[in-house]
Amino acid sequence: MGFLQDKVVIITGAAAGIGLATATAALDEGARVFGIDLAPAPTSLQENPNFEFLRADLTDHDCPKRAVQACIAAFGQRIDGLLNVAGIADNYGSADSVTDEVWDRCLAVNLAAPVKLMREVIPIMREAGKGSIVNTSSKAGLSGASSGVAYTASKHGLIGVTKNVAWRFKTEGIRCNAISVATEMGMTGDFSLWDQAAMEAMRPIHAAHMDMGIGATIKAEEVAQTLLFLVSDLSRRVNGAVIPVDDAWSTI
């Protein structure tokens, strides 16, 4: 019997990367997982009877409500955990160059969507008298010297939300924690569109942590283990924490 046996857990970004690794590991620990992603459902999990999936854009105004309703329809009136893993990068734009499109999209996916999902699950958790929410922040949630202004704002904001929710609902059995991840995973796209001057300004900080030539130093599966610890009863007294998963990058 796994340490998440029969727990119902919602995981965003479940089609790939950290989200998929977390969904896979949660299922291995006995959880019933409801995944959400803009991409198609992962083929590796489609045959698992304890996995349900909603393909949707988290920024659609009705997506959080639809997702929670679909989870309840699949697994019953119970949500033990919410893992907000989905996120997008910006183009490293600074305050003098960030476009409205990049700013709005980054804040919508990285900050607004997690908050709106929390708004939907907290009443269910409150009724049960327990629940655990884990948000995925970043080195950029702790530092101003690792990414663009939009991504930095969104991840700082998510840490603030985490602490606010932890304090507000601590007497109702609801916990809220965050991890701060440092990894190159997901760094895709047309790099020619990125703010090259801003990237150069961040390069010394990046170089202090990872060899940019060999890619990620932290595996998705390693990040997933910390997420699962925080959503599980193993961390029942951990609340309002921000745990770095960054191989000591947060020390600089």
Swiss-Prot record:
Protein name, UniProt field: Short chain dehydrogenase andC
UniProt GO MF annotations: oxidoreductase activity
Consequence of gene disruption: Impairs the synthesis of anditomin but accumulates preandiloid A.
Pathway given in the UniProt record: Secondary metabolite biosynthesis; terpenoid biosynthesis
Entry-linked InterPro entries: NAD(P)-bd_dom_sf, Sc_DH/Rdtase_CS, SDR_fam, SDR_superfamily_enzyme
Source taxon at top rank: Eukaryota
PANTHER family noted in UniProt: DIHYDROANTICAPSIN 7-DEHYDROGENASE (PTHR43477:SF1)
Record's keyword terms, sorted: NADP, Oxidoreductase, Signal
Binding annotation for NADP(+): I11, D57, R119, Y151, K155
Keyword Transferase belongs to the record: no
PROSITE patterns in alphabetical order: ADH_SHORT
Signal peptide from the UniProt entry: 1-25
Name of the gene: andC
Job of this protein: Short chain dehydrogenase; part of the gene cluster that mediates the biosynthesis of anditomin, a fungal meroterpenoid. The first step of the pathway is the synthesis of 3,5-dimethylorsellinic acid (DMOA) by the polyketide synthase andM. DMOA is then converted to the phthalide compound 5,7-dihydroxy-4,6-dimethylphthalide (DHDMP) by the cytochrome P450 monooxygenase andK, which is further prenylated by the prenyltransferase andD to yield farnesyl-DHDMP. Further epoxidation by the FAD-dependent monooxygenase andE leads to epoxyfarnesyl-DHDMP.
Entry EC no(s): 1.1.1.-
Similarity annotation: Belongs to the short-chain dehydrogenases/reductases (SDR) family.
Active site: residue positions: S137, Y151, K155
Pfam families (UniProt xref): adh_short_C2
One BP annotation, GO: terpenoid biosynthetic process
CDD domains xref list: SDR_c
